[in-house]
């Protein structure tokens, strides 16, 4: 296998997230649940990373830690070579990063408003973050992206509950 020369888009180094368990006694030593422990990976342009595991294995916690929705216990996260661990950057930089790095949580019913069509749910952040200057431009871009991932443009006008 050849060595990668380019900078990874996303990189995690020894990322760990632990949650304290409530103590039952004052003198009891603090215990922790290890939700994600010593996770390292690199994602290069054109690659896809799938995080697979049983329910409760820490997949969502890992994703939330990468996106700094939950602070890490230790380790580092890099986006395009820039250390973004816990988003210790300016408010403007956080806004830029959050427009470029996003996730949809595994329960689509909790992630997507059931009263808003898929196309509108995707168009809103595009318009908010300046990735489209009008609704018509956003719709055109979204329909193209739907085709790229193998979905029909008609998906734009469907509601979340219409997907299996």
Label every PLM stretch briefly.
Residues 52-53:
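The feature captures the beta-strand-to-loop junction immediately N-terminal to the Walker
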Residues 1-32:
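ABC-family P-loop ATPase nucleotide-binding domain
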Residues 75-86:
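Conserved ABC transporter NBD signature motif
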Residues 26-29, 84-102, 128, 135:
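ABC ATPase NBD coupling module
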Residues 107, 114-128:
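Q-loop/switch helix immediately C-terminal to the Walker
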Residues 83, 136-154:
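Conserved ABC ATPase "signature" region
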Residues 10, 34-36, 98:
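Conserved structural motif at the start of ABC-family nucleotide-binding domains
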Residues 67:
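Helix-to-loop junction immediately C-terminal to a conserved catalytic motif
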